Amino acid sequence: MKQNKTKLVIAVLLIAFLFTGCIGVDRSFRNMRDYVLSYSGNEFEKEFEFSFGSISIGMAELVLDFAETEEPIDEILSEIDNVQVGIYNNLSSSKVKSSLEELKFITNKMESAGWDCIVRSVNKDEMTAIFLKYNEETLNQLFVISVNNDEVALVEILGNLNKVIEIAIREKGLDFAMKH
């Protein structure tokens, strides 16, 4: 009897580990990562790269149920299906190019894959771009690319982002603090 319980516990832990969604990023994310990193011509080292699926996000929601917060974090998380993040450190002695030319190449690549660019910024040694993708009328994907001399950061969020925006506006209104 005790041996069966031990096997059951091990099986449950193994299943929980395998299906939490905390795994490597998907092919489209890797393709964009490879494109951005190779364009600079520099050598990069992966600091971290991961993906949280719906089960991992659901587990985070359960933990947040016990946290005392007035923020609607659990409600927002319930609308998110997947989050992919990658941080890559520049190992080269040369600086990463953050130019308008590079931004145009990245934007063209993303637009050819069905993304709409909503923010593009090049400022001295830093470049940032934010892209959206829609499924019919619903905003369901957000992709952020940030490049500076030291690192490249990529973030992709999938889910019902219309609902996430609705929750944010409901809770905070349109009174967003702006840095001048």
Predicted segment positions?
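Bacterial N-terminal signal peptides that target proteins for export
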Residues: K2-I10
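C-terminal motif of bacterial Sec signal peptides marking the signal peptidase cleavage site
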Residues: L18-G21
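Bacterial signal peptide processing site
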Residues: I23-D26
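Early exported N-terminus immediately downstream of N-terminal targeting peptides
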Residues: S28-E102
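Extracytoplasmic
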Residues: E45-E47, S78-N82, N123-D125, T138-N140, ...
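Short Gly/Thr-rich strand-loop-strand
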Residues: K104-L132
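A short, solvent-exposed beta-edge/loop patch
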Residues: F131-N162
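A recognition module on extended beta-rich or small alphabeta surfaces enriched in W/G with H and D/E
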Residues: K163-H180
